[in-house]
């Protein structure tokens, strides 16, 4: 199992996203207003807990996993998101040696 998969397995996307987005359940999924663009009329941001992904069907038309969510929300690159999410998940990152 890769480090990325281990982190994804330890962090529930609902826990992460619900820290900054108010979500309501709609069947198996959750819906709310996208945190990445102004919109207060039509909730177009959907979290799919079964696949650990999210998608905005509105203005930004983007989606991804927990890494992409944190990268977009914080303006970070993958390396920064990896370190923060690894710490949150309790996963120790070991440097790759050539």
Identify the role of each PLM range.
Residues 1-98:
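N-terminal structured subdomain of primase-like DNA metabolism proteins
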């Amino acid at each position: 199992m890769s480090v990325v998969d281990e982190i994804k397995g330890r962090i529930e996307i609902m826990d992460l996203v619900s820290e900054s987005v108010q979500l309501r359940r709609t069947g198996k999924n959750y819906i709310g207003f996208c945190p990445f663009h102004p919109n207060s009329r039509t909730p177009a941001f959907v979290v799919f807990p079964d696949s650990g992904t999210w998608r905005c069907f509105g203005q930004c038309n983007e989606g991804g996993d927990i890494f992409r969510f944190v990268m977009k929300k914080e303006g970070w690159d993958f390396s920064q998101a990896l370190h923060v999410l690894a710490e949150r998940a309790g996963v120790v990152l070991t440097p790759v040696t050539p």
